[in-house]
Amino acid sequence: MFLVSKYNYFWIFLLIASLIPTIAFSISRVIAPISKGPEKFTSYECGIEPMGDAWIQFQIRYYMFALVFVIFDVETVFLYPWAMSFKQLGIPAFIEVFIFVFILIIGLIYAWRKGALEWS
């Protein structure tokens, strides 16, 4: 009789998960046409030539808004599972989450005082 250990299914899955993309990329490399013309290295927007330079500078305020958004988005991702299991985790987890939110509020106050949230 064939005995399967506890982790053999994992290793088989990992092997198959590695082989499928490798085989797909290999077949694509063999079958796909290769064109190395100058058009391959040009940039385009929605199928047409770009208007102006493709590399533009944007103002730092967009970066700061994106950074603040990501910080509070990550906060939401961490707080939601905690809120769903609040009864099981108890007071120590509440204190940890309070410290986590307090650190984020300090970061928000810092960004606010530096003027990162001003749109002018």
Curated annotation (Swiss-Prot):
Transmembrane region(s): 7-27, 64-84, 89-109
Membrane topology: Multi-pass membrane protein
Catalytic activity line of the entry: a plastoquinone + NADH + (n+1) H(+)(in) = a plastoquinol + NAD(+) + n H(+)(out); a plastoquinone + NADPH + (n+1) H(+)(in) = a plastoquinol + NADP(+) + n H(+)(out)
The name this protein goes by in its record: NAD(P)H-quinone oxidoreductase subunit 3, chloroplastic
Subcellular location: Plastid, Chloroplast thylakoid membrane
GO BP of this protein: photosynthesis, light reaction
Record's GO cellular component terms: chloroplast thylakoid membrane; NADH dehydrogenase complex
EC number: 7.1.1.-
Species the sequence originates in: Anthoceros angustus
Protein origin, superkingdom: Eukaryota
Pfam family, one: Oxidored_q4
Gene3D superfamilies noted in UniProt: NADH:ubiquinone/plastoquinone oxidoreductase, chain 3
One example GO MF annotation: quinone binding
Family annotation (PANTHER family): NADH-UBIQUINONE OXIDOREDUCTASE CHAIN 3
Similarity comment: family membership: Belongs to the complex I subunit 3 family.
